[in-house]
Design a protein with these regions (language model features):
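Conserved acyl-donor/pantetheine-binding loop and adjacent beta-alpha core of acyl/acetyltransferases
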Residues: 71-112
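Conserved GNAT acetyl-CoA-binding A-motif
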Residues: 107-110, 136-149
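A short helix-loop-beta-strand connector motif used in the catalytic cores of GNAT acetyltransferases and
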Residues: 46-59, 75-82, 109
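Conserved beta-hairpin
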Residues: 54-70, 85-86
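Conserved N-terminal entry element of GNAT/NAT acetyltransferase domains
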Residues: 1-14, 18, 22-30
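Conserved active-site alpha-helix within GNAT-family acetyltransferase domains
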Residues: 126, 149-167
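Conserved GNAT-fold acetyl-CoA-binding loop/helix
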Residues: 25-46
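Conserved acetyl-CoA-binding loop-helix of GNAT-fold acetyltransferases
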Residues: 112-115, 121-135, 160
Length: 186
């Protein structure tokens, strides 16, 4: 049985980092990445711990072990992960429903979602996202993330729980097209 919870401490952070490493785009072959998805960012332990002290991320547990995670990344951490800094700068230029994101403290970035292979296609992604909403809808109006167009499984999953595409852009340095997706909780 899978239960949804918030990160409780450093052991959870270590288990998140393990799942992240195992499922990173450079750790899985192309066919697996295409069919099962992959993670893009590798967080350093110090930053991930700080993020979870401020706003604990959602985890899925089975028999006490973290089998999935949905990271909560408040805007205040925008400068802590260099690879994400361009994304935050770009988000500052966007509007949602005719309102600028820049200066609006009522949104956060869903930093990454990952489900252990043995728990995929069991509703864990959806369960974690719904727990995220239950946990933070009183403090935030929306969550935003970006998903590589080369990761169709992730795009489908995000759309299924309620994310909508708000912007698409090409990153020439990474030779990748990204979809910026938003889940408006209002």
């Amino acid at each position: 049985m899978v239960e949804y919870d918030l990160v409780r401490g450093e052991d959870d952070v270590a288990q998140i980092l393990d799942l992240q490493r195992i499922n990173h785009r450079y750790a899985v072959d192309a066919a697996t990445g295409q069919s099962q998805g992959y993670t893009t960012v590798q967080h350093d332990p110090e930053t991930l711990s700080a993020m979870n002290r401020r706003y604990p991320s959602v985890v899925a547990r089975s028999e006490g072990k973290v089998v999935g995670y949905c990271l909560m990344m408040a805007q205040e951490f925008r400068d802590r992960i260099p690879v994400l800094m361009p994304m935050f700068r770009m988000l500052d230029t966007l509007d949602w429903r005719e309102q600028p994101l820049a200066g609006n403290p009522r949104w956060f970035v869903m930093g990454q979602v990952c489900v252990a292979e043995a728990y995929r296609a069991m509703g864990v992604f959806d369960g974690m996202n719904h727990h995220l909403r239950e946990s933070y809808a009183d403090r935030f109006d929306m969550t935003i993330t970006e998903v590589s167009s080369a990761n169709p499984r992730s795009l489908r999953a995000h759309r299924r729980v309620g994310f909508e595409t708000m912007h698409v852009y090409e990153d020439p340095e990474a030779d990748e097209v990204w979809e910026v997706v938003i889940w408006d909780w209002r």
